[in-house]
Amino acid sequence: MKKKTLVPLLVFLMGICLVSLVVYNTDTHEKEQSRTTAQLNATTYGERIENEIINGIEITDVLKQLLISGTGEINQFDTIAKNIMSDSVESVQLAPADIVTDIYPADGNEAGKIDLIHDKERGEISIYARDHHTIVTQGPFELKQGGYGIAVRNPIYLKDENGQEYFWGFTIVILRVPDIFSDATSALSKFGYEYSLSKTDNPWSDNYKIIYQSDRQLTNPVSYDFTIGTENWKFEVTPENGWENNTLIAVISVFFIAITMLLVTLTRMWLVSKENKNKFQILAHTDSLTGIY
């Protein structure tokens, strides 16, 4: 193979190798940066969601303290519940002896007065909360009074006149879905992320079920994990356009390939020019009649 062909070919191959290396390193760096940023967002907004749920739990704790100080009774329940309600709370409830007897607001929530232990959908997890002294969350489910919500049930234990502990019942708060997540999920959508919030199906299971998610399927997401009571929650995030910065990769590829082709062209031109120069030098020193150099 002639030198003027071989050398440009070698330059081209070396250039392609260099382009591949640059593209690979850039792609790796961009993915790492994207995952770092996504993890930061998942943690930030996952903590916000966690805090919203904890705020709901704190409402049940307030009721618990009132029950303790009131020896199992809460006077003016509606007034107290009204003052501790928040925008993401659908209702506040009391369930002495496992039966929901008081709900605020009462209007539209009459169907919520049920026997938790003997309810088909709520019985098993309510019994678990009672027997294991742990807060449980359940849902989202369609509420009998309309809409969707997540129930936070806090088992309450009081002491009788002999100092013996006994199970009083539950203080309950129903959190609106998706209202409770709206601030976090709206912000992530504006930043260009898809998301999914899931939790273990129940306290004794390792299987996760989706509580709320965006429209698209998540690909290789980062996550923020937290625990409520004895249940594990997971908030996952992924960029809506994927982890790769395809625009940047395309620009870099085109730029370096163009430089490679320019070097190949210049190399070939230089070799051809050098070859022609040598030919002219030989002709200049060669006798035109005899052909002797």
Regions found by a protein language model. Name each.
Residues V11-G72:
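Juxtamembrane extracytoplasmic/periplasmic/luminal helical "stalk" adjacent to the first N-terminal
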Residues L63-L66, D98, L283:
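Amphipathic, soluble alpha-helical interaction motifs
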Residues I68-N232:
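Intrinsically disordered, low-complexity polar/acidic regions
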Residues K274, N278-Q281:
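Signal-transmission coiled-coil "S-helix" linker that connects upstream sensory/regulatory modules
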